[in-house]
Amino acid sequence: MALIEVRNLVKKFDDHTVLNGVNLELLQGELKVVMGPSGCGKSTLLRCLNRLVEPTSGTISFRGTDITSSSTDVLALRQSIGFVFQQFALYRHLTVGDNVTLALRKLKKMSRAEANEKAAFELSRLDMIAHQHKYPEQLSGGQKQRVAIARALAMDPAVVVFDEPTSALDPVMVREVAELFNRLNRDNITMMCVTHDLLFARQISEKVIFLDQGVVRAEDTIERLATNHPDAKVREFFGREGHVS
């Protein structure tokens, strides 16, 4: 059974259909990448997974239960499906350590000592423990990304979803984040990632989903999508900028 199963997902904003019958599955331990042109519905799809955006119709099953139901405990769902935002969403007035421990203390009701221990574990795993007393403004973009990931992992989610994790990073930092994703994947962390970056996508996942105008048009390796797919729009998207070797 898939950890997350999306069936016929539709999201409309007034008369504008952003997602139009999306179907996909995410398996335990899988790292799934979603790509597509700007405005195709990628970020909206992620936000539907933990009800940051309410679907218009369709179902999203998490561990076999439809989480679009009105009876769903949305707060518990958001602890199970962690979200790492494009701009990291760190609290500027809190240290790195306190950014990670805040939800542990407020939502999981951990003592400060317990929360500090958990935060130290996650920050150490991401090579950020030496920065635990710094403030976000003292960190590089890549370091901020690691703090945001540590904060999500500290809640022990079943899935972590990432919205454009490399959009604010230079090429060196992008490689570092790719290495981090691969390490987390080896640790059996289940992830779904939206990205516009073909090189990054190739570094972290064999296959990608292509979303266009709210519809899943294809799922395959970037190489096959760029050269062998029957849809010219798909070939053009994945063959752009010489990203296919």
Residue ranges and their predicted role:
Residues 50:
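Helix-to-loop junction immediately C-terminal to a conserved catalytic motif
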Residues 66, 108, 112-130, 179:
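Conserved ABC ATPase "signature" region
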Residues 67-82, 112-113, 186, 226-229:
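ABC ATPase NBD coupling module
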Residues 135-139, 143:
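Conserved ABC ATPase signature
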Residues 154-158:
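A short, proline-enriched helix->beta-strand linker immediately N-terminal to the Walker B motif
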Residues 160-163:
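Catalytic Walker B motif of ABC-type/P-loop ATPase nucleotide-binding domains
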